[in-house]
Amino acid sequence: MSNCLKHPWLENGLLNLIKNADVLPIRVFKCQPLQIFEYIRYEHPIRCKLSDTEFYIEAEFSSQSISDLNNFTEKRITSLRGGIVTLGNFLIHLIPSQSGIIPWIQVESFNFQGCEGAVFGNPKAITTSALFNALLQSPYLAALANEFNRSIKEGSSYQEASLSQQEKPNDNTSNSRDIKNNIQFHWKNMTSLSIEECIIPKGQQLILEKESEENTTHGIYLEERKMAQGLHNSVSETPEVKQEDNDEDLDAYSWSSSTDSAGEIPSLPTNRKILEKIAEKPPPFESPLEDDETPDQTNEHEANQVNVSQLPLNPRGSGISGRPVESTEQLNSSLTIERSQSIQSTDSKQRVETQSHRRSKIEIFDAQDELFDRSICTTIDDSTGKLLNAEETPIKTGDLHSTSASSVISCTPPAINFTSDICNEQIELEYKRKPIPDYDFMKGLETTLQELYVEHQSKKRRLELFQLTNNHQKNSEACEMCRLGLPHGSFFELLRDWKKIEEFRNKS
């Protein structure tokens, strides 16, 4: 069994583990053998010294590890002095003291190997190692150990305060609250919290329920008040409508809510019967023209329609004059006379203005493969809706295109005879392509196929002639080789060619 402790590992193993520590305690799983050197405490928790024949460290056995040992053997753990155990899971603790940091381990699982009796080697305390002692003097490890021990003390005091509060719920809990507020929790000791520490006291629950009820009732009251205020504002902002007494035969139009002044707004004191008859007639855009009607007749239709905008206005600017009207025929006749006078004056002005702005369209057909006569059709757009037909003048063109390529106009059109009314007008030319007359698509397809067939046959003849000449030359060479009694074939031809190349190189 002494061979199990042949290689001491305690110093180097603990150095590497503690050097890279960032939290306490350090949890380790390492199957390494150690010997129970000496017992320090025989009662629970049982403490002893474990050595690797060179150094020893204080250890504490957990209750779970002791129960596992009792299931394995009937021996008590305190009777195993000098026995060899193999560690499984264990925790490394660092305790700050006046002399420095003291390390110890807490064994959670181990396997008993046997060999109770003598102690191997002369082990010393792990703190006597120069390397290990230098590591324990690190301020980082000191701060880490102080923080861990302070958190343990604060957690224990908080547990005592919570237990006393549960035993006396009716007493004043101000002292326990002060203790709770002064405690500084760290993330490392959050695992030590119990369920009782997370429960909210009954007094605090009542306070929270009252605050939530007050907030909800206050919020509902504010919403109802806002809705009532909004309804009151909407009712107060509605404009007041004026009620005016009017006659039975007249329709009154009131603009009491308008921002315009009374002098700028026209009134309509016309007779109701006249307005009803005017409304029965269809508007101009709803009376379609017949096919036989001319543009002159359309102007007559427009002149006969009653337009309210053309009614005579009062010189004072108060709208339509309130003169008496006997019948609708008299009203229509007066309106048509005024309408005709205004149309005549506007027509004379428009003719003078549009004389320089008239434009004529000339449509010219483009030339194709055949020679044919072209005709020029001119149309003049008049602003009043009248159409002027220009004289059609035949134009004879020469040979514009010698081939069937894409036609391009390369000459200017000849002089055109227009009437005296449009002699000074601007001329706009529009060229349109005229389709080719009497063109047979199938005939064109047959000619194209015939040309392709002729070209294919010529290529075929040339290829056959080339093959015949080549074969004749090869046959003549083979016959000559046979006549001379020389070997012939592809291999011998290649050999002969290489010999010719070699002779040529030697000569050069």
UniProtKB/Swiss-Prot annotation:
PANTHER family: ADRENOCORTICAL DYSPLASIA PROTEIN ACD, ADRENOCORTICAL DYSPLASIA PROTEIN HOMOLOG. It is found in: Chromosome, Telomere; Nucleus. This is Protection of telomeres protein tpz1. GO terms for biological process: protein localization to chromosome, telomeric region; telomere capping; telomere maintenance; telomere maintenance via telomerase; telomere-telomerase complex assembly. It comes from Schizosaccharomyces pombe (strain 972 / ATCC 24843) (Fission yeast). Residues 379-508 are annotated as: ccq1/poz1-binding. Residues 348-358 have a biased composition (Basic and acidic residues). InterPro entries: ACD (IPR028631), TPP1/Est3 (IPR019437). Residues 159-178, 235-269, 282-358 are annotated as: Disordered. The gene is tpz1. Residues 2-223 are annotated as: pot1-binding. Interacts with ccq1, pot1 and poz1.
